[in-house]
């Protein structure tokens, strides 16, 4: 049995706020958000753009990463996390 990849993702809304979620189909989920059929939070903040994502081996791992990311309360804390992890990806 193959395990489907899962993603924790961060969107930037048109009003510059950030939205975090998880999915097993990143491209489809982004399209759903931009069609106004995603989370209530993003429906009134369109369009949204993908700012960052991480890949996981399970939905549960992606959900855990989402929860940990959301513990960062301020935009600056979230952007600092993204900047650090994007640098790590480039160095691998």
Curated annotation (Swiss-Prot):
PANTHER family: UPF0213 PROTEIN YHBQ (PTHR34477:SF1). Belongs to the UPF0213 family. It comes from Streptococcus pyogenes serotype M1. Residues 4-80 form the GIY-YIG domain. The lineage of its organism: Bacteria, Bacillati, Bacillota, Bacilli, Lactobacillales. This is UPF0213 protein SPy_1412/M5005_Spy1151. It comes from the Bacteria. Signal peptide: none annotated.
């Amino acid at each position: 049995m193959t395990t489907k990849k899962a993603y924790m993702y961060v969107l930037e809304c048109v009003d510059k706020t950030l939205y975090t979620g998880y999915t097993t189909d990143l491209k489809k989920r982004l399209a759903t958000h931009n069609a106004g059929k995603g989370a209530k939070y993003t429906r009134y903040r369109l369009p949204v753009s993908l700012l960052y994502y991480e890949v996981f081996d399970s939905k549960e791992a992606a959900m855990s990463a989402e929860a940990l990311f959301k513990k960062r309360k301020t935009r600056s804390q979230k952007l600092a996390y993204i900047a650090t992890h994007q640098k790590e990806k480039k160095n691998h």
